[in-house]
Amino acid sequence: GPKEPEVTVPEGDASAGRDIFDSQCSACHAIEGDSTAAPVLGGVIGRKAGQEKFAYSKGMKGSGITWNEKHLFVFLKNPSKHVPGTKMAFAGLPADKDRADLIAYLKSV
């Protein structure tokens, strides 16, 4: 698979992360259920990219990523740079704290 990103992920606050999820992510992503707009994100930590019932891009399917804190931290800063060709039409979360909080929330669900 791809190399592990060389980043240190700060401690995040899951409740702040939930607010970020609700405002930035929930228009497309759900935590559970059968959303078809975007992959369902409950249990995403430890999951191989491109697994859920979703028509993933070739870039995502072929990325070889197993989602962990470091990959999410880098991906969420600039999705199309980390996984070229991704269908995720989101510019990214520039603030390290926002990404750390969102990851803390995703770890909790």
Curated annotation (Swiss-Prot):
The keyword Zinc-finger does not apply. This is Cytochrome c. It comes from Tetrahymena pyriformis. GO terms for molecular function: electron transfer activity; heme binding; metal ion binding. Heme c binds at C25, C28, H29, M88. The lineage of its organism: Eukaryota, Sar, Alveolata, Ciliophora, Intramacronucleata. Keywords: Electron transport, Heme, Iron, Metal-binding, Mitochondrion, Respiratory chain, Transport. Coiled coil: none annotated. Belongs to the cytochrome c family.
